[in-house]
Structure formats: C-alpha cells, structure tokens
Amino acid sequence: MQINGLNRLTTDVLIIGGGTAGCYAALTIREKSDASIIIAEKANIKRSGCLAAGVNAINAYIVEGRKPEDYVEYAKKDADDIVREDLLLTMSERLNEVTAKMEKLGLVILKDENGRYVARGNRNIKINGENIKLILADAVNSLENVIVINRLNITDYIVKDNTILGAVGFNIDTGEAYEIRAKKVLCATGGAAGLYKPNNPGFSRHKMWYPPFNTGAGFAMGINAGAEMTTFEMRFIALRCKDTIAPTGTIAQGVGAKQVNSLGEVYENRYGLTTSQRVYGTVRENIEGRGPCYLRTEGISSEQDESLKKAYLNMAPSQTLKWIESGKNPSEQNVEIEGTEPYIVGGHTASGYWVDTNRRTTINGLYAAGDVAGGCPQKYVTGAMAEGEIAAEDIVKELNRSDITENAFSQITADEYADKLTDERIKEYNEYLRREDKDTIFSTEELEEAMQKVMDTYAGGIGSHYQFNEKQLKLAKEKIEQIETLSEKANAKDYHELMFVYELKERLTEIGRAHV
C-alpha cells in the first residue's frame, strides 16, 4: 500500500482542527471578511474535539454581579499564579458575548421564571448542551467559501525562515496526501491525551476525561518547527467519578456534595478547594488508608436524583447508566471519585504555545487558540471560542494589509521549499505503509503501551500517586528516547494505522522534547 496521489490546495486561511476554537474562528472570519477558509479535521466536525459528547454547563461565564477581572482572579488562584494575566483578561472579556452568539445559533440555555440564566455557582450557567457541537458544525457547514475536509490528518507545518506557508497531511480514508498553502494558519488541534497509563485497562482504556483522539498534533508540529512553547511541566489531573470518568462538578456544584473519605469525614477543607488541591486531598486520603473517597450524595432529595441523572445524559450518560444498573439512586449511595491520568491541555493549565494577546505564536503567520494555546488556563468551552474569535479578528486584520505577501524570500523559493517538504513527507508515509511485519520489532500499539508504562512509573502517573523526582524524570527521558527510535521502524497496514503511527510520534515528541 502507498499514498494515493497528491492534492495541492491554496486558501487564505487554513484552520487545523475543527473543534470548538477552530469552528468558532471560521464563523468569525467569514462574518468579518470574504477570506477563503479550509478546515482540516482529523475526524468529522459534527462530533469532534472536546464537545463531541456535549456539555451540561457553560463553565466560564461572567454571572450577574461579577466582572471579567473576577474570573481572572479565580483562574490565577486555581493555577497558583502560573498564568498570563493579559491572556486571561482578553479571554474573560468575551465570555458572555460568545455565549450569546451560541444561544442565537440554537443552544438551549436554562432560564428561571424571570428569564435570567440559571447559574450554577459563581462562574457557571446551566445548558442543555448534548448537541452543542452539532450546532457549531452546522453553522460552519452553512458558510460560503469555507471548505471542510474531514478525515484529514495534518502531520507537519510548512515553515521557512520562521514564516508559515501551510501544512502537509494525508486523508485517513482515501490515502491521498494534501499540501495546503495558506496566507495565515490557525492551530486549534487541542491538547494531548494518552501520554500516561489510563485509569481503565484494555477495551476501556479510552474511557477517559480528555478525548483520546487529541494526541497533541499541534504541540508536536510547533516543537518540530521551532515555535516557542510554555509550561509543559504543568499537567492537568481531573477529579472524576470512578470508572465512568464522569465530571464531579455536576454533583459538587449541582447538589452541594462534599468530598468525604471512607470514615465519613469531610476532608476537602483540610487540603483546600482549588482543582489541584481537591485531587491532592483525595490522593493523600487513599495513601494514608482512609480511602476510598466519595462525593456525599446520600440523603439528597428525589428531585435532585432526577436532576443529576438528566444532567449527565447531556455529557456523560455512562454515569446515569451506572446508577440505573446498580438499582440505586444517588441519594442511596455516595459516588466514588478518583484522579485521572495526567494530560497536557492549555484549556485547564498554562501549557501550550507561547502567544501574544492576539494569539499569534512566535512563527510568523501562525496562530494558536483553545487547548493548544498556553498561558491561559480555565478556558472551558467559551474560553476556547473567545480565543478563536481573538485570533480570527487579527487574521482578518492582517489579511487586509497590502504587504501581506512580502516575505524575506521569493514566491518561487517558497514553492520549491514547500514542494520539497511535501515530497519528503510522502516518502516517509510510504515507508511506514510499505514496511512489512517481519521488518518491524514492535507494533504501534505495543510502543504506545510501553510509552504509557514509562510515564506512569517514572514521570508521575496514577501508579506512583503522581509523584516523581529528578532521577526518575531522567530515566523517563532516556526510555522515551529509546521508544522514539523504535517508532521509526513502525509499520502501517492501511491509512488508519498510519494515523496511529503519527499519533504515537506526536506524543513521543512532546514528551521527549517538552514535558520531561
């Protein structure tokens, strides 16, 4: 098997990743200009990215009586001041605006008898959001002069003299290679999951907090192209309902459930209430023999029972099914909780591309928004949209400049360079596709498991209670480099397996050159 031909396309704007930030950026660009857009999406924009399964709340919203600066202070405190305040403020100022726009597109936001949004805490409002990604995708698909290419896996930027010219990839279904040239490129590929050994084994290994298909492609491409990155040591570990990995905030904020240990003691105040402190407290209680730990739901009302079961249907139906299968409502049994494996995700930590307030990266013409952009934690859905909008507005502004095509090199030189890189990548794709089983030592899946085992053992995974030291990190780096060398001899029986090869390579790149 080999790559099935080459498509060369040209556009004003290339958006890599058709998730929350990417789709919203496309809407903004077309609203404010006539620029042509290509969206390259590895899956299908109808159900891709973090919104694929829906959400039951907007977790970043400036509720009545609050102001954007309050949200900045919340995010700073939660991240122990490891933030860029300028990025947080520019995001926070747009949260309500993008929410209103989503409501106009058809998102159902719950309201009280006075017509006000129903708040859930100081920064959240309740929604019926199972179809939120469908709403966003339908809006994008209705735009003129926007081409959405689903099932297109982008593997490399085309960068010359620190200026981006486009990107290269292949179609997972047809096997066609793509060289897409663009004046401006927005990276919106999300964060990275699958770096560490997950909570659940075997068939259920992808039952995780973050989309398992977000493997950090944007991080890896940026690192390989020389873009400045930031704060990859800042990992996100989610506190979730055990086994289902369903969100705990729905219970904690929805019915005011406290974190308790096996003795029935409320332990959350002992350690603190920030995101990291809630996870830390749960880990310490288990280490010290007072586990398992729970969210205390026993004794809530029957109305609250029904409210919780309905809420989880909007984003994590497995939790509702677990209650039904057990024959017990939340009011009859506490909900056991645990920490997930660590993730690299700029929507909850400060890890990702180093960007300015317009979301420009350090590579000319390349922007980053959403979970791939660093410095600005606690984005959630609306924060990703806000960053997509910020980047889009600056892209439009830059496209309108008369000197946009003036570079330090000629167009002929740029074309020659792009074509050469594309040819090299196609050759690389074909090497993986043509290599037979007898010529490779380990399968991609075996190498992935080895990578996750190394990270779990030496780089602070679940198995080591998230703890590590300098010696362990050095060992992790050595072993990851060995696995990276072995990955060069991987093979792929088809184009889908070729995608798996590159997903492995992406994670090894961000671990070996940025994380450990």
Ranges and model annotations:
Residues V13-I39:
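N-terminal Rossmann-like FAD-binding beta1-loop-alpha1 element of flavoenzymes
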Residues M229, E233-C241, V372-K379, E393-Q452, ...:
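Active-site-proximal substrate-binding core of FAD-dependent oxidoreductases
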Residues G129-D156, K160-T163, V168-E179, F219, ...:
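Helical element adjacent to the flavin cofactor pocket in flavoenzyme catalytic cores
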Residues N59-M91:
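Glycine-rich active-site loop/strand segments that organize a redox cofactor
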Residues E31-A53:
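Glycine-rich FAD pyrophosphate-binding loop
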Residues N96, E103-T155, T231-Y380, M385, ...:
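Mobile, glycine/GP-rich and aromatic-enriched active-site lid/loop segments adjacent to catalytic centers
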Residues R8-T11, T174-K184, T362:
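Core beta-strand elements of the Rossmann-like FAD/NAD(P) dinucleotide-binding domain
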